[in-house]
Amino acid sequence: AIMAVQATATVMGALGFTNHVVAQIIALILVVVLAAGSGILGFEAIMKVQTWITWATAVLTIVYLVLVAPTIDFAVLSSRPSAPLTAVLGAGCMLLVGFGFGWINAAADYSRYLPRAASTKGVVGWTTVGAALPTVILVFFGILLVGSADESLSEAIGGDPIGALTTLLPTWFLIPFALVAILGLIGGIVMDIYSSGLSLLATGVPVSRPVATAIDGTIMTVGTIVVVFFADSFLTPFTAFLTTLGAVIAAWGGVMLADIALRRKDYDEPSLFTPSGRYGSVNWGAVASLIVGSLVGWGLVVNASASWLSWQGYLLGPLGGREGDWAGANIGILLAMVVGFVGYWATSAGRVRAQEKLPSRTYAQGADEGEQ
């Protein structure tokens, strides 16, 4: 939502709209109405919106790549000095959090919309290709563009990533560019708001689905207002958010991967719906692994430009401290996943084996036990 608002306001300015603050307000209202409105309307509306967004985004993205390709200068790129290992690791971990880990918690949300008859291999294969292929192409192309330009483009991207890229475009393509940028971002927002609304309902909050979706949309709006109108730049809160939340998601992902690796049978679905089932209410081994993994992750990342996160990096002493070369490597993200995986395996392997020895039950049995 933040990038969609910034991109819209920047394009409006390029087209002659001189009041940037008013442009941001108009852009915010437009994004919120389109995204939250579609999410509240429900699944059928989302599917119709997503179909058009997908095709429009694909076509306009290809046109954009063709238009800016001449600005790539391989002579300049080859003259760039090589980055140190720690910088490469840091950039790789940020990409991992921003793209790869973003699918860990979203996988179940997107999968819930698929028919039960869908092939497991097909779901995994097409999800992997659909998520990875565009990301690899666009990130690689973006590296070529930024590496070919002077430092002013990199600085501009730190404040407004998508809007900065308009400087490479002819004026006649600004409106189509705005469409591809905004529609692509809104497409993701729509799905995420709808899914997060369902997740909120799963926690037991006694509200209807549209109300739950509206709550999440409100949170999104408040966060967007804070970053767009009060933050010094986009990059500072963005990287702070990625590394801080990324450590938790990485640890949680490690727990999930360990659980998948340990199990030889499918989950007994009726038992998932009752605290008296074989899985119980809480797996304290998983909780402990998540907490310890998160703490290890936070201890090995830093956010130098975000003063409110100065407490992070408390485990970097042996690696040169918060100002050393390894401070920006973000290895805490990787180690958080390792700790989550190893911790869950060590604490829950026996528990999983015991669960799989029990006989399966019917939904009726699960419901009866839940009522008791």
PLM segments and residue spans:
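Hydrophobic, small-residue-rich membrane helices and short re-entrant helix-turn-helix hairpins
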Residues: 41-54, 105-137, 152-163, 192-211, ...
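C-terminal membrane-solvent junction of multi-pass transporters and transport-like membrane proteins
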Residues: 56, 253-342, 357, 361
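Hydrophobic, membrane-embedded alpha-helices of multi-pass small-molecule transporters
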Residues: 65-71, 81-145, 169-193, 280-301
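TM-loop-TM module centered on a large, flexible mid-protein loop between adjacent transmembrane helices
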Residues: 141-189, 206, 225-244
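Hydrophobic alpha-helical segments and their helix-loop junctions in multi-pass secondary transporters
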Residues: 5-9, 55-80, 96-102, 141-151, ...
